Amino acid sequence: RGGKNLVKKVQKFSKVQVIGHLEGLCHIYVDKDANLSAAKKIIVNAKMRRTSICGALETLLIHSKCLKSHGVPIIKKLISSGCEVLVDKKINKIFKNKLELAKKIDWETEYLSPKVSVKSVSSVHDALDHISKYGTMHTDSIISRNFKTAKVFLSRVNSAIAMHNASTQFADGGEFGFGGEVGISTNKLPPRGPVG
């Protein structure tokens, strides 16, 4: 545990396996079959409950088929909750170019503040590709009523903690019955997940 550069250096040069708690660049994917009411509550909790923790939402991925029905009310709810929202061009067009555009660096940034990047994706596979490219293997979640789609997400996302219809902030040792934690191990070898 420590700064990003310290953790990476220790992991790179250690002669023994070390447990690393690195960044928590957490994602939520809103599927076209998501329940809007639940999605708004989950997303606001995931971003705004405690913005500076490693389990806070940093990137929101929304299926392109539900941008108007789900994306617009979710983004408006985030903004009214005090969150700064950065979006891709497709979403900004819906908002008549009134929101700030996300840059490439935003997809790989752990803000630890009331700020979130929002991107439209064409499918669960597109969401998984984005998470694979930019994620930190910490905590990622899908919001969907379609269990088949959720199963694809949960089986393919390479995260220490994968969730379905739950806030990424529900990712501490206490919630899993492990007691207090030192960090979330994103290593592929055990232990993985909350470590106390």
Locate each region found by the language model.
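Active-site phosphate-binding strand-loop segment of PLP-dependent enzymes
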Residues: 1-2
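Short Gly/charged-rich anion-binding patches and loops
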Residues: 5-6, 73, 126, 149
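ALDH superfamily catalytic-core signature
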Residues: 7-113, 164
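Conserved C-terminal structural/oligomerization subdomain of aldehyde/semialdehyde dehydrogenase
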Residues: 103-196
